UniProtKB/Swiss-Prot annotation:
GO biological process terms held by the UniProt record: DNA repair; DNA replication
Binding positions for NAD(+) per the UniProt entry: D32, V33, E34, Y35, D36, S81, L82, E113, R136, E173, K290, K314
Species, as recorded: Escherichia coli O17:K52:H18 (strain UMN026 / ExPEC)
Chain's role: DNA ligase that catalyzes the formation of phosphodiester linkages between 5'-phosphoryl and 3'-hydroxyl groups in double-stranded DNA using NAD as a coenzyme and as the energy source for the reaction. It is essential for DNA replication and repair of damaged DNA.
Annotated ranges, domain BRCT: 593-671
Origin organism lineage: Bacteria, Pseudomonadati, Pseudomonadota, Gammaproteobacteria, Enterobacterales
EC number of the protein: 6.5.1.2
Keywords: DNA damage, DNA repair, DNA replication, Ligase, Magnesium, Manganese, Metal-binding, NAD, Zinc
Protein known as: DNA ligase
Cofactor(s) in the UniProt record: Mg(2+); Mn(2+)
Catalytic activity entry: NAD(+) + (deoxyribonucleotide)n-3'-hydroxyl + 5'-phospho-(deoxyribonucleotide)m = (deoxyribonucleotide)n+m + AMP + beta-nicotinamide D-nucleotide
A Gene Ontology cellular-component term: cytosol
Length: 671
């Protein structure tokens, strides 16, 4: 007679097998009623023997207790976004850039997938068992949605098959099929619940429930499309090969993934999917095109927040007609005056649209737009509403001309438009309340000074009450003054003060980015910080010297030079330093002169570090003249292997590359 343990093992194995056939292979062998019977049998046995329940049991998909709030998970490998193209010409230009950058006649094949309109998630398996899941968030840090993801039947709690890596992070999209979306809304209308505008909102709302039991009732599904962390195992050296391997391990992959041998085949795939879009049964907003070879991907690399080897080819946006009620003007962080059309509300691609950007005065002139006109609205990229054209044949008699302001609508300062630029700007600088608000919001944002708890509404109140005029004023705030703001109690106020104190310790690159210099994003700020090393050197740099920094041209160099030439900006920086803002003193990075065992070497980190974070380790290595790479190749000089080091360590040993452990790294860093 079988033991209880054997019965449980057999039932779990059988149920996982049928889940795989149903969700991955789309070839069920048994009817739903038989699956339900097996599940009931397993649940009854586990109820009688709770000490034998395992976390990966199919019964454990049922939602756990509600959470008070989501905790955060930091992505070990950032979840990058993709650049978009919207027409064949742009795609062909992307194709040419890839071919040119590879600088060879070697063949490029493309792996083409559906661009699902859902929520990007990261799922981590350790020894084949699902241990955590997170949203994309800002690409660096996401929300912990492990309990909710465990309720999604399409996602295996345990992988099956051979050669499963010790740690495998799968990336993919959670989405809601059209039938499930309609059922949810039908139930909501009947019970007076929330009706969702589109399947994507419904999927996001379902996945971000604090109560996993609610998520468990929603018919969410999942397709995987990539990998993040990979340790203690190997994967095929092509993107398609990896997807097929995922499928063998029980992970769902779209059956529309196609390998294309040329740009012409990619375009044919795009048009075929566009034609089939209405019959897919779920929402997509384009196709994703990736270089199939992992070796070629590595050579192409990344730019800022996106890979050079992939692009999202978006479908034409959906359009609707409505009327322009008025045109108002918004003022941005750099003083840019942006006209915004206030519309008669209309549903476009499932979203109620009441505003649309008009970009600038040239765009208004190009459109020939007047207030009161009937216009065609498009959600560009299915996200940002914009006015496509005016329906002149239906222009009402009482339309009014759009008059672009000569003075800032917020502070009254002169509006100027530099020759050769399309954007008109307020000249008020920080005396302009709108610019001040947006500049401060940028200054405290996560990727800048990262002041936790300092949200937009707090900044708005601080500016309106004239508590804060410059970024330096933020560090003069007291808990008592903050308590006077709306919805700000003593505890919350003290938390903000503590966060401001913590934010004083930053990096030179973050500080530069936080200053909000025109055209200086994160990548440029990092480049400037690495090249000049000190604030004094950067402030004294000429336009010619600035252009020696990689990817800095005449326009960016001029903006940086002009920013530091402005006395008011230098005063703000001095005030910030006086308030205690600081960063580690730079170590001169000169591979020929620096006395460091890492100087001039290409270093790869793998495995988990116990004494410092990987980010901190990378920063120290760079300070000491190393170039930190993400993968092992013949050009790698040194591999630092932490706990549970995987395929990178194996490859280093195969290539005969020097390998040291964390203890040796710390010793060398100290020397």
């Amino acid at each position: 007679m079988e033991s209880i343990e054997q019965q449980l093992t057999e039932l779990r194995t059988t149920l996982r097998h049928h889940e795989y056939l149903y969700h991955v292979m789309d070839a069920p062998e048994i009817p739903d009623v038989e699956y339900d019977r097996l599940m009931r049998e397993l649940r009854e046995l586990e109820t009688k023997h709770p000490e034998l329940i395992t976390p990966d049991s199919p019964t454990q998909r049922v939602g756990a207790a509600p959470l008070a709030a989501f905790s955060q998970i930091r992505h070990e490998v950032p979840m990058l976004s993709l650049d978009n193209v919207f027409d064949e010409e742009s795609f062909l230009a992307f194709n040419k850039r890839v071919q040119d950058r590879l600088k060879s006649n070697e063949k490029v094949t493309w792996c083409c997938e559906l661009k699902l309109d859902g929520l990007a998630v990261s799922i981590l398996y350790e020894n084949g068992v699902l241990v955590s899941a997170a949203t994309r968030g800002d690409g660096t840090t996401g929300e912990d949605i492990t309990s909710n993801v465990r309720t999604i039947r399409a996602i295996p709690l345990k992988l099956h098959g051979e050669n499963i890596p010790a740690r495998l992070e799968v990336r993919g999209e959670v989405f809601l099929p059209q039938a499930g979306f309609e059922k949810i809304n039908e139930d909501a209308r009947r019970t007076g619940g929330k009706v969702f505008a589109n399947p994507r909102n419904a999927a996001a709302g379902s996945l971000r429930q604090l109560d996993p039991r609610i998520t468990a009732k929603r018919p969410l599904t999942f397709f995987c499309y990539g990998v993040g962390v990979l340790e203690g195992g190997e994967l095929p050296d092509t993107h398609l090969g990896r997807l097929l391997q995922f499928k063998q391990w029980g992970l769902p992959v779209s059956d529309r993934v196609t390998l294309c041998e040329s740009a012409e085949e990619v375009l044919a795939f795009y048009h075929k999917v566009e034609e089939d879009r209405p019959t897919l049964g779920f929402d997509i907003d384009g196709v994703v095109i990736k270089v199939n070879s992992l070796a070629q991907q590595e050579r192409l690399g990344f730019v800022a927040r996106a890979p050079r080897w992939a692009v999202a080819f978006k479908f034409p946006a959906q359009e609707q007609m409505t009327f322009v009620r008025d045109v108002e003007f918004q003022v941005g962080r750099t003083g840019a005056i942006t006209p915004v059309a206030r519309l008669e509300p209309v549903h476009v691609a499932g979203v109620l649209v009441s505003n649309a950007t008009l970009h600038n005065a040239d765009e208004i002139e190009r459109l020939g737009l007047r207030i009161g006109d009937k216009v065609v609205i498009r959600r560009a990229g299915d996200v940002i509403p914009q006015v496509v054209n005016v329906v002149l044949s239906e222009r009402p008699e009482d339309t009014r001309e759009v008059v672009f302001p000569t003075h800032c609508p917020v502070c009254g300062s002169d509006v100027e438009r530099v020759e050769g630029e399309a954007v008109a700007r307020c000249t008020g600088g920080l005396i302009c309340g709108a610019q001040r608000k947006e500049s401060l919001k940028h200054f405290v944002s996560r990727r800048a000074m990262d002041v936790d708890g300092m949200g937009d509404k707090i900044i708005d109140q601080l500016v309106e009450k004239e508590y804060v005029h410059t970024p330096a004023d933020l560090f003069k705030l007291t808990a008592g003054k903050l308590t006077g703001l709306e919805r700000m109690g003593p505890k919350s106020a003290q938390n903000v003060v503590n966060a401001l104190e913590k934010a004083k310790e930053t990096t030179f690159a973050r500080f530069l980015y936080a200053l909000g210099i025109r055209e200086v994003g994160e990548a440029t700020a990092a480049g400037l910080a690495a090249y000049f090393g000190t604030l004094e050197a950067l402030e004294a740099a000429s336009i010619e010297e600035l252009q020696k920094v990689p990817d800095v041209g005449i326009v960016v160099a001029s903006h940086v030079h002009n920013f530091f030439a402005e006395e008011s900006n230098r005063n703000v920086i001095s005030e910030l330093l006086a308030e205690g803002v600081h960063w580690p003193a730079p170590i001169v990075i000169n591979a020929e002169e620096i006395d460091s065992p890492f100087a001039g070497k290409t270093v790869v980190l793998t495995g988990s570090l116990s004494q410092m974070s990987r980010d901190d380790a990378k920063a120290r290595l760079v300070e000491l003249g190393a170039k930190v790479a993400g993968s092992v190749s013949k050009k790698t000089d040194l591999v630092i292997a932490g706990e549970a080091a995987g395929s990178k360590l194996a490859k280093a040993q195969e290539l005969g590359i020097e390998v040291i452990d964390e203890a040796e790294m710390l010793r060398l860093l100290g020397s």
